[in-house]
Amino acid sequence: MDKKRIAISLVFSIIFLSAVFYKVPVREVLNVLKNASPFWMSVAVGVMALTITLTGVRWDQVLRSQNWRLPFWQVIRATWYGHCFNTALLGPAAGDIFKSTLFAREQNMPLVNLLSASWLDRLLAGVGSIIFAVLVVIFTLMTGEQLQIELPSVNPWIIAAGVLCAAAVCFLIWKFRLLDKIAFVKKLKDTFAAAVVKMYKSPGRALTVILLGCVGQILLSSILAWTLASVTQTDLPWVQMLWVFPVIAMLATLPISVGGVGVREGASLVLLGNYGVVQADAVAASLLCLGVYWLNAAIGAILLFIGKPKK
C-alpha cells in the first residue's frame, strides 16, 4: 500500500473531522452517543453482517460463472477479509486486491482470475446500485416530495476541460497500447475480458449478481438510517430522506479519506441537516455507523488471523 496515499488520506480525514467538530461541539456529540439505543445499534450491526455475507454470495455466483467451484463458506470467509481491508485501507479497490491475493494463496489459484472475478462482481453490483438509485429517485418523486439538494455552481469550461483530458488519456492508452506493455496488466485485462464473455453466457447468474448488488446497496445505505434512529429523539421525514442515505454511503467510499472518516460525518451534517436533523444527532449517527463498519471489520480480522480451516 502506498504510504504517501495513506498519509494524504489521513490528512484529509483530520481536516474533515476538524471542520465538523469546529461546527458541532464534541461534548454535544458525546452526550448524544451516551443515550444511543442498543436495540437499533444491534440492528445496524446485524444488517452490516448480512450485507457482507450477501456480498460473498454474489462473489460466489461470479466465480461459478467462471467454472471455479470453490467451497462456499471459504468464499464467504474471504469476503469478510475483503470488508476488513476495505475499512482499514482506502476503499473497495484496495480491499479487493488484498482479498484476492490472500484467497489466491489459500486456494492455490492464479491471482488474475480472482481479481477479474472481483472486478466483474463490482461491475455488475454497480449496475444494481444504479437501479437502486433510480428507484429511490422515482419513489421520492412519486410521493410528491422534492429533493432538497443544492448543487454547487461549476464553470462549464472546467467540466469540459476535465472531460477532454480524460478522453485524451484514454485515447493515448488505447492508441499506444500502454497497458499491453505491462505483462501482468495485459494478462489481467485479457482474463477480465474472458470473464465478461463467460458471464454473458450465464444470464441467470448475471441477473442474480445484479439483484444481490441492488439488495446489498439497500442494506448498506440503511445502516446510517438505523444508527440515526438510535440517537434521534424527534420525528423525521424518513420518506423524503431516502435518497440521502445512499448518497452518503457512496461518498464515504471515495478514496480520499481513511475508511470514510470525516467524509461521512461532513456529508451527514450537511445533507441530513436539510431535513431538520439536529447537528449533534447527524454527527453521532455517522460516528456510530463508522463503529458498525469497524466492528464487522474486526470480525473479518479475526477470521483472517484464524486462517483457512484445516481439512
Describe each PLM feature range:
Residues 68, 108-109, 234, 256, ...:
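Helix N-cap/coil-helix junction residues
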Residues 98, 102, 115-118, 128, ...:
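Hydrophobic alpha-helical membrane segments of integral membrane proteins
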Residues 94-105, 258-273:
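Re-entrant/interfacial helical elements at transmembrane boundaries that shape
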Residues 81, 85-89, 115-138, 284-299:
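Membrane-embedded alpha-helical segments of transport systems
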Residues 73-77, 95-96, 107-121, 277-288:
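Membrane-interface alpha-helices at helix entry/exit sites of multi-pass transporters
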Residues 76-108:
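Extended non-transmembrane interhelical loops and adjacent amphipathic helices
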Residues 1-80, 139-253, 284-287, 292-311:
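Predominantly cytoplasmic-facing regulatory/coupling regions of multi-pass membrane proteins
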Residues 83-91, 246-261, 265:
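Transmembrane alpha-helix interface/packing and boundary motifs in multi-pass membrane proteins
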